Amino acid sequence: MECPHLSSSVCIAPDSAKFPNGSPSSWCCSVCRSNKSPWVCLTCSSVHCGRYVNGHAKKHYEDAQIPLLNHKRSEKQEKAQHTVCMDCSSYSTYCYRCDDFVVNDTKLGLVQKVREHLQNLENSAFTADRHRKRKLLENSSLNSKLLKVNGSTTAICATGLRNLGNTCFMNAILQSLSNIEQFCCYFKELPAVELRNGKTAGRRTYHTRSQGDSNVSLVEEFRKTLCALWQGSQTAFSPESLFYVVWKIMPNFRGYQQQDAHEFMRYLLDHLHLELQGGFNGVSRSAILQENSTLSASNKCCINGASTVVTAIFGGILQNEVNCLICGTESRKFDPFLDLSLDIPSQFRSKRSKNQENGPVCSLRDCLRSFTDLEELDETELYMCHKCKKKQKSTKKFWIQKLPKALCLHLKRFHWTAYLRNKVDTYVQFPLRGLDMKCYLLEPENSGPDSCLYDLAAVVVHHGSGVGSGHYTAYAVHEGRWFHFNDSTVTVTDEETVGKAKAYILFYVERQARAGAEKL
């Protein structure tokens, strides 16, 4: 929106010496010292955290209004309202009086000058950091891809994703998907599409969460992000262009609230699928179909029309079998799926006392068994029997008719109890390799020896107590090495650490598919 408060609030010099040292994206809040979601005041250059960290940037604005309310405003006070601030990671500008993002500038273009100065500071800090690391590596006998920093192993080749304000749920999913090899390779090999018009060509576009633009492509921005994550040219990538498109086409995820990573993943895959079906990213429908032809036709699972890489990789088919307990009539229904949501069995959900610590541990097999076991539907789910002509008691059982190349398993850790959505914090043991899905197949005799074996590719973990709070990180394996992705920080880790994680979403890749990808 056009903000009328810029002239009275943007008072700092673009190259102000008052700015802190170091890269702007890692600046700390002057109150709580948090480096998450830093915002710089464009009146006094002080740095505070965003409203969904500890809210000190907003409090800074509110505190500045008290003298103006208690005293007659002087000309000097009119100019010092501390109303406008800038995100130190995405460089978007926000006005607290308008309570919205700002798209205009002052007559002298001060906002853009501050933005460019912050970008230069970020680039300088990054260049200095790379030079320092390169020098250390030259003098080190360690692996050329690794560098020991403060006792942890930092990955040089992997790229983190900057947190743009409680966007860790998006970052964890993006990092996980970038390590599903066949899926990632497909997007990286798509031709690039330039969406900017002549007025903005050659200039970086700074999107805000309230801007409107009909000419956007989720596929194109997703492709750019995947290309940036493993090119090794930077330690952290700022995905504001992708997030702008996400915020535009998926309004549920606008703002700075913490969101559910699984819900975001489903929305993302669904919208990628729909856009690829229509060829909206500038690639013709025939070109997309030609790309898809490289994937085995027998492994495609259509959801809402023609198959795409989304359904070819993640698509499976469930058989839902319902039996009437009165007349014995059997009803079968086939449902396509992109992921399976598994309950954690109730016997494992209660908190254990110290003397119960050595009791049985919940395993992924327990969750899969609970999902596929025969169950009697309760009174609220009576089945409409076409033979009996009325709702009857019945049993239900799921079979997997077709397994996907990438099996996504979502553990249902959040449950509604009364008016609260509580988290099930139970540890679930899961295999890092050799997950055998054969016993859950409808026709296991028709499957090949390795077609039912899956190896773990990525894990999304939720840290905290509630879906609307906490923090998301991801573990993923790349070229045989496990990495931990915590927003902009990427560290090398080991299998033991991964195995101890309290998984929320597990991504498994078919062993046959992985072997095929390695041959390409």
Swiss-Prot record:
Query: According to the lineage, what is the superkingdom?
Result: Eukaryota
Q: What happens when the gene is disrupted?
A: Usp3-deficient mice show normal postnatal development and genome-wide increase in mono-ubiquitinated H2A and H2B. However, loss of USP3 leads to shorter life span and increased cancer incidence. They develop an develop lymphopenia with age with increased spontaneous DNA damage.
Example GO CC term: the record gives: nucleoplasm
Q: Which sites bind Zn(2+) 3?
A: 41, 44, 60, 82
UniProt keywords, alphabetically: Acetylation, Cell cycle, Chromatin regulator, Cytoplasm, DNA damage, Hydrolase, Metal-binding, Nucleus, Protease, Thiol protease, Ubl conjugation pathway, Zinc, Zinc-finger
Where do the annotations place Zn(2+) 1 binding? 3, 5, 95, 98
**What are the GO BP annotations of this UniProt entry?**
DNA repair; DNA repair-dependent chromatin remodeling; protein deubiquitination; proteolysis
State its Enzyme Commission number(s): 3.4.19.12
State one molecular function term (GO): zinc ion binding
USP domain ranges (all copies): 159-511
**Binding-site residues, Zn(2+) 2:** 29, 32, 49, 56
Residue ranges annotated as coiled coil are: none
Q: Give the protein's biological function.
A: Deubiquitinase that plays a role in several cellular processes including transcriptional regulation, cell cycle progression or innate immunity. In response to DNA damage, deubiquitinates monoubiquitinated target proteins such as histone H2A and H2AX and thereby counteracts RNF168- and RNF8-mediated ubiquitination. In turn, participates in the recruitment of DNA damage repair factors to DNA break sites. Required for proper progression through S phase and subsequent mitotic entry.
Q: How does it assemble?
A: Interacts (via UBP-type domain) with H2A; the interaction is less efficient than with monoubiquitinated H2A.
State the family named in the UniProt similarity comment for this chain.
Answer: Belongs to the peptidase C19 family. USP3 subfamily.
The protein in question is named Ubiquitin carboxyl-terminal hydrolase 3
Look up and give the organism this protein is from. Answer: Mus musculus
Upper lineage is:
Eukaryota, Metazoa, Chordata, Craniata, Vertebrata
